[in-house]
């Protein structure tokens, strides 16, 4: 469906290394600023244990997980909104993202340069945020001038847009990121048309050392993120990359040794999925079991359209079994026998984990 999560941050904080670990790629990750110029794009499979449980029952020939598009974006520097560094290109790339994973360096290492010469995660996070705010201020100010020229026409749509823009500008002037949750549904629809950088759903990835020496810096970043209600996921990106290249058996042994249930990378992928407002439904048959990605609160026809537009256009009904019922009843036949298979129409809101078979006619 093309939902994109951008990896952003200052140069040399671990963005490209994280991208490599998540996508199992080998793009350059060098010890100098702007190693990444053009954004790198990769698909990341969503780890989902439910697929294995479904396959234990169905024994399908193929298993296809859901995926997330990750984009490694060039490092930002102070003054990017005025064109410094790769500023204009960087900001343009961010505008295309649906959510942001903001990597912040929290570890000391004299062998890895820092663009500002010292480790200060709050300062670094604020640099990125300020550049997004400054870019949005320019966008909003131009839009306000355009609206003001039309105010005399008493156009209701223009007036509503002007009022929202003034509200947004006041927040930006105070150095605040735009929290779209603070607006009603109609206002959000208008705001989305502005493509504001500072309104992108964001979480922080704290790149820490593996010896506990990053604790102070990490705590400062968490305290800073809590103010705006953002999540911080701490991890040693270097170690995560080492885990990512292990085969399945070696990875399992390593995680057991480290007393970890799963790689932290999985949490990062799920957080991106969550921020994008996505969920999964399944189709299951002898040829393939597949996880499909849809927006939260999608109707059954919307969900069918992800498979093929004909499915949505000619939608008749959906045969739905919840994941829990499918497993407890040992598949479709058992679910039918126990009355757990439901016929749903066009108004049905698909739930995460639903196992669905669509009926359509075109």
Explain the meaning of each model-derived region.
Residues 1-113, 122, 141, 147:
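Conserved G1/Walker A P-loop phosphate-binding module
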Residues 2-8, 13, 19, 146-349, ...:
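C-terminal-of-GTPase-core extension/linker across diverse P-loop GTPases
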Residues 24-25, 50-51, 75-77, 105-111, ...:
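Conserved nucleotide-binding/hydrolysis micro-motifs of P-loop NTPases
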Residues 57, 100-103, 131, 143, ...:
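Amphipathic, soluble alpha-helical interaction motifs
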Residues 76-81, 117-119, 123-132, 151-157, ...:
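Flexible beta-alpha connector loops of hexameric P-loop NTPases
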Residues 95, 99-100, 107-135, 139-142, ...:
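Switch/coupling subdomain of P-loop NTPase systems
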Residues 96, 351-352:
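Short, flexible surface segments
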């Amino acid at each position: 469906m093309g939902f994109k999560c951008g990896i952003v941050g200052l140069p040399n904080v671990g963005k490209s290394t994280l991208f490599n670990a998540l996508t199992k790629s080998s793009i350059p990750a060098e010890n100098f600023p702007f190693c990444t110029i053009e954004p790198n794009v990769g698909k990341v499979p969503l780890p989902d244990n439910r697929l294995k449980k479904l396959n234990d029952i169905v024994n399908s020939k193929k298993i296809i997980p859901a995926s997330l598009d990750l984009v490694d974006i060039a490092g930002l520097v102070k003054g990017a909104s005025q064109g410094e560094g790769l500023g204009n290109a960087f900001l343009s790339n961010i505008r295309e993202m649906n959510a942001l994973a903001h990597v912040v360096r929290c570890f000391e290492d004299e062998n890895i340069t820092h663009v500002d010469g010292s480790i200060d995660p709050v300062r670094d996070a604020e640099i990125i945020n300020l550049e997004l705010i400054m870019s949005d201020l320019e966008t909003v100010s131009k839009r306000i001038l355009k609206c003001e020229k039309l105010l005399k026409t008493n156009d209701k749509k223009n007036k509503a847009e002007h009022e929202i823009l003034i509200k947004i500008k006041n927040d930006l002037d105070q150095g605040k990121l735009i929290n779209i949750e603070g607006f009603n549904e109609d206002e959000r629809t208008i705001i989305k048309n502005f493509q504001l950088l500072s309104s992108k759903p964001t979480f922080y990835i704290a790149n820490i050392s593996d010896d506990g020496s990053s604790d102070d810096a990490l705590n400062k970043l968490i305290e800073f993120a809590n103010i705006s209600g953002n999540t911080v996921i701490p991890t040693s990106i270097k170690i995560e990359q080492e885990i990512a290249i292990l085969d399945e058996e070696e990875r399992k042994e390593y995680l057991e040794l480290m007393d970890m249930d799963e790689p932290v990378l999985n949490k990062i992928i799920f957080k991106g999925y969550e921020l994008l407002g996505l969920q999964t439904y399944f189709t299951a048959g002898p040829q393939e079991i597949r996880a499909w990605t849809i927006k939260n609160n999608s109707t059954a026809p919307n969900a069918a359209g992800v498979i093929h537009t004909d499915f949505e256009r000619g939608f008749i009904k959906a045969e739905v079994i919840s994941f829990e019922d499918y497993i407890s009843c040992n598949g479709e036949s058992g679910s039918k026998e126990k009355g757990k298979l439901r016929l749903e129409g066009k108004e049905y809101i698909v739930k995460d984990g639903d196992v669905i078979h669509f009926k359509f006619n075109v």
